[in-house]
Amino acid sequence: MAYPQLTDKPGALETAAAIRSGALSVAEAVDAAIVRLEKLDGPINALAVPDFARAAATAKAMDAGGPDPDKPLWGVPMTVKESFEVEGLPSCWGHEKLKNYI
């Protein structure tokens, strides 16, 4: 089954293939995702807790190690819902009482 292309931007599968082939680095993919988020997220405020510095550092480390063929989406940028606990980031689940829970 083919997946419909909803935008002119490459999806996760295309991005993963470009990273595996060496046509795109993880750092380039992350940088592009950050630029797009900074440009488009303002009015909708979908990104509750940006962690761009850690994303960029992780991308550099991943590029230094090379692709993992056993992980099909290796290196593809993604976001994590703030209700999942991530070390060093708040997880308030949208509740004001939990705004300082880290």
Where in the sequence are the language-model features?
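An N-terminal boundary/leader segment
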Residues: M1-A57
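Flexible N-terminal pre-Rossmann segment of NAD(P)-dependent oxidoreductases
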Residues: P4-P10, G65-V76
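Short, functionally important structural connectors and interaction interfaces within domains
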Residues: A16, R36-K39, G65, K81, ...
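Broad hydrophobic/π-residue packing in well-ordered secondary structure
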Residues: A33-I34, L47, G66-P67, L98-Y101
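Alpha-helix boundary/interfacial micro-motifs
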Residues: K39, T58, D68, C92, ...
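Histidine-rich, glycine-flanked metal-binding segment
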Residues: P50-K71
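Enzymes and membrane/adaptor proteins characterized by extended Gly/Ser/Thr/Asp/Glu-rich
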Residues: P72-I102
